[in-house]
From Swiss-Prot:
Catalytic reactions on record: tRNA(Cys) + L-cysteine + ATP = L-cysteinyl-tRNA(Cys) + AMP + diphosphate
Enzyme nomenclature, EC number: 6.1.1.16
Cofactor note: Binds 1 zinc ion per subunit.
Organism encoding this protein: Thermoplasma acidophilum (strain ATCC 25905 / DSM 1728 / JCM 9062 / NBRC 15155 / AMRC-C165)
Binding, ATP: K268
Protein name (database record): Cysteine--tRNA ligase
Signal peptide span: none
Chief site of localization: cytoplasm
Length: 452
């Protein structure tokens, strides 16, 4: 498997740190507003990646943080005249509902930042001890100039960063590029006790505290949107490597491209901000997954109604073909070798996650099938179904009603097979008769059972 690594700016062969196991962290959202299609692109993509890796035999621990304390959350709470924690809780529920609706089901654990205050304080204390951080009257800051590799991920020199910095002057900081680790308490804001007085964590330190808790100082894959490369991911690297003294925080960095809407940058000011929920009022989750995965994940994507309409057509075509396969009961074999099709798709999916080529091959395969799909034999149809299921296992493009029927039948036949093995023939026959009553024929051919 090979994919583009932002850290090396090249397509690298992947080698996990521990054989067969992958630790993957993806930056989660700040829960302070409705979630948009930019979020959808990132989280659908990494959902597909995690599921693909598991299909390939890896044990993947997929960790995602939830930023539940932040300036934006505090400002939103003031606008709504409620507590910041109420804002965070409300939008976290919405986020999890959106992810469930989009079939994003691969995350092992969502870690809320406020549950890791002790770990955050520990990291800041170690950075101060090692001379990388300093306290001021308004907080604790990381001194960027002390970390020689700052800018490596974003391909900038420290001089470029310093000269290009455009921030409001803060006389408490030694240098304008230094970033905050701990913000001392302001009236009316949430706070936690710390060695530097009551306050709250900075954004960057939250993620490294969480990843160190679960993965230690070094792990396999870090992902997120390309807008996070600088300064957020750059800061994460500086923090953890300054503490650990190691060469890596994450060995591989994967970033998704930004989204334009009708050829314009998506933003609230342009009033072209498209939320996940708005899209799902008109389109199915499978349509959106297809649209967002059917493009190079690193490129900028132009999002439009036309894109969704085309994706809906393709999803319907593939699902229609799948339903025909479920009902196939002829005598013909397949013109294409399903195992060869899957092998080609595996090669494409593991070559920088080229899901677009996988979809193209599935469309071509469906085209071949539809030339004589009514005459395809049951065993041949089952092999073709395996191709669709393999793609769906990470892409999530089969409609629930389409996938459910085939899955339920196979589960029942597995149960029947076990009953026959245990010589419980009466119970096995009841399953066969139940299926027949619902128009599904079951036939045993030696060690193989087919249905139509």
């Amino acid at each position: 498997m090979r994919f583009y690594n932002t850290l090396t700016r090249d397509v690298d062969e992947f080698k996990e740190m521990n054989s067969g196991r992958i630790n993957m962290f993806v930056c989660g959202p700040t829960v302070q507003d409705h979630f948009h299609i930019g979020h959808a692109r990132t989280y659908i993509f990494f959902d597909a990646v995690a599921k693909l890796l598991r299909n390939l035999g890896y044990s993947v621990f997929y960790l995602q943080n939830i930023t539940d304390i932040d300036d934006k959350i505090i400002n939103k709470a003031r606008e709504m005249n409620i507590q910041p924690q109420d804002v965070a809780d409300m939008y976290l529920r919405e986020f999890l509902e959106d992810m469930s609706a989009l079939k994003v089901t691969s995350v092992n654990y969502f870690a809320k930042s406020t549950l890791y205050i002790n770990e955050i304080i520990s990291q800041i204390s170690r950075l101060i001890e090692k001379g990388y951080a300093y306290e001021t009257s308004d907080g604790v800051y990381f001194e960027v100039s002390k970390f020689a590799d700052y800018g490596q991920l974003s391909n900038q020199s420290l001089d470029q960063i310093i000269h290009g910095y455009r921030v409001a002057v803060n006389e408490n900081k030694r240098n304008p590029e230094d970033f905050v680790l701990w913000k001392k308490r302001k009236p009316g804001e949430p706070y936690w006790d710390s060695p530097w007085g009551p306050g709250r964590p900075g954004w960057h330190i939250e993620d490294t505290a969480i990843t160190e808790t679960y993965f230690g100082p070094e792990y396999d894959i870090h992902g997120g949107g390309s807008d996070l490369i600088f300064p957020h991911h750059e800061a994460e690297i500086a923090q953890m490597r300054a503490i650990s003294g190691r060469k890596y925080l994450s060995h591989y960095w994967i970033h998704t491209g930004m989204i334009n809407v009708n050829n314009e940058k998506m933003s609230k000011s342009l009033k072209n901000f498209v939320t996940i929920r708005e899209v799902l009022k008109e389109y199915r989750p499978e349509d959106l997954r297809y649209a967002l995965l059917n493009a190079n994940y690193r490129t900028q994507l132009d999002f439009s109604k036309g894109l969704l309409e085309e994706s809906r057509k393709q999803v319907e075509y593939l699902n229609s073909t799948f339903r025909k396969l479920v009902n196939a009961s002829g005598n013909s074999d397949l013109s294409a070798d399903p195992s060869a099709v899957i092998k080609r798709m595996v090669d494409e999916a593991t070559n920088d996650f080229d899901f677009r080529s996988v979809f193209r091959d599935l469309i071509d395969f469906a085209g071949d099938l539809n030339k004589n799909i009514e005459s395809i034999s049951r065993p041949a149809a089952q092999k073709a179904i395996d191709v669709f299921r393999w793609v769906d296992s990470f892409a999530g493009i089969l409609l629930p009603e389409t996938a459910r029927l085939s899955g339920i039948i196979d589960d029942l036949l597995d149960l029947r097979k076990n009953l026959r093995t245990e010589r419980k023939f009466q119970e096995a026959d009841r399953i066969r008769d139940l299926l027949l009553k619902n128009g599904i024929h079951v036939e045993d051919r030696g060690d193989e059972t087919i249905w139509w």
